[in-house]
């Protein structure tokens, strides 16, 4: 496996024999043969202690309730330079499982259009793939016979490039699987079970083009003597700032599907360049990678209407 791994906050009773499965443990228990050279690299102190969550790169400090410097946020994906020739050779003729993660938490938001402390992590679009993530995926494509991308995140990340990449064999959403969810992920990857879920979010080509993004920020009450306009956000004074969600209900699919309908019907100036991610006339096909409710299966389904019986009284039976 390449990439990061996160799970939701769970509570287990170890004394009662309960276990928490990370992705490595789950894959091993389900009979997968893993690349030990790659595992040793990721677990080494140089890598594990510097990058990823243990390296201090998680949600804090993103853009939330009490952080003075949101620009310090980093994905923490390790650079291409950590992969030695021997490690890369060990990945030849294998199936690469690339894990993409973004943390999430209440009271915190990702802040678009900010400058990162690390040039390899681009945060004009924090839900887009960073340069290091892109480089890691290219390495996987170069050395492995098949590449599967696992989205270990609740956030709908920007993956339009992966969707259109013929070198990517599959993209699987895992969310935050908790204590045992990776066992189910392993069953999906092996084909033991047939995936049939559908995503509950819209995966946008560029999340920053959505109207809700315009309202992101920290706005302090300037007439508040305790805080003032230059105050640092802390746990004690977090009630001194506000956010106006003027987009109303039009977040996620409610925005994209409503504007799509208006675009088709030629109303509401829906096809203007306003809110377009590419500067051209707004076009649903260019704004949405995966729509709300999207999902694939290992099999195919067919729905057929056999007959329709319309009664004189106005009722119909199909």
Annotate each predicted stretch with a short phrase.
Residues 1-318:
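C-terminal non-catalytic regions of proteins with extracellular/luminal or membrane-system context
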């Amino acid at each position: 496996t390449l990439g990061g791994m996160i799970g939701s906050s769970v509570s287990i009773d170890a004394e009662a024999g309960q276990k928490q499965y990370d992705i490595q443990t789950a894959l091993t228990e389900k009979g997968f043969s893993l690349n030990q050279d790659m595992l040793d690299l990721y677990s080494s102190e140089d890598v594990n202690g510097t990058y990823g969550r243990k390296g201090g790169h998680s949600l804090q400090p993103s853009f939330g309730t009490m952080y003075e410097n949101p620009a310090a946020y980093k994905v923490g994906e390790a650079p291409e330079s950590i992969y030695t020739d021997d490690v890369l050779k060990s990945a030849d003729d294998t199936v690469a499982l690339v894990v993409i993660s973004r943390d999430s938490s209440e009271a915190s938001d990702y802040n678009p259009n900010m400058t990162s402390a690390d040039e390899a992590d681009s945060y004009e679009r924090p839900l887009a793939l960073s340069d290091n993530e892109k480089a890691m995926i290219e390495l996987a494509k170069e050395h492995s016979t098949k590449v599967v991308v696992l989205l270990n995140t609740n956030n709908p990340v920007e993956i339009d490039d992966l969707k259109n990449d013929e070198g990517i064999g599959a993209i699987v959403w895992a969310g935050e699987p908790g204590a045992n969810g990776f066992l189910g992920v392993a069953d999906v990857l092996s084909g033991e079970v047939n995936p049939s879920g559908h995503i509950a979010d819209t995966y946008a080509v560029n999340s920053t083009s959505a109207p809700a993004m315009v309202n992101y920020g920290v706005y302090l009450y300037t007439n508040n003597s305790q805080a003032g306009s230059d105050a640092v956000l802390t746990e004690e004074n977090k009630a001194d700032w506000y956010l106006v969600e003027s987009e109303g209900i039009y977040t996620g699919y409610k925005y994209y599907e409503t504007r799509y309908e208006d675009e088709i019907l030629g109303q509401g100036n829906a096809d203007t360049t306003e809110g377009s991610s590419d500067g051209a006339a707004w076009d649903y096909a260019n704004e949405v990678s995966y729509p709300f409710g999207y999902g694939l299966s290992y099999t195919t389904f067919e729905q057929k209407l056999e007959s329709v019986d319309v009664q004189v009284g106005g009722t119909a039976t199909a």
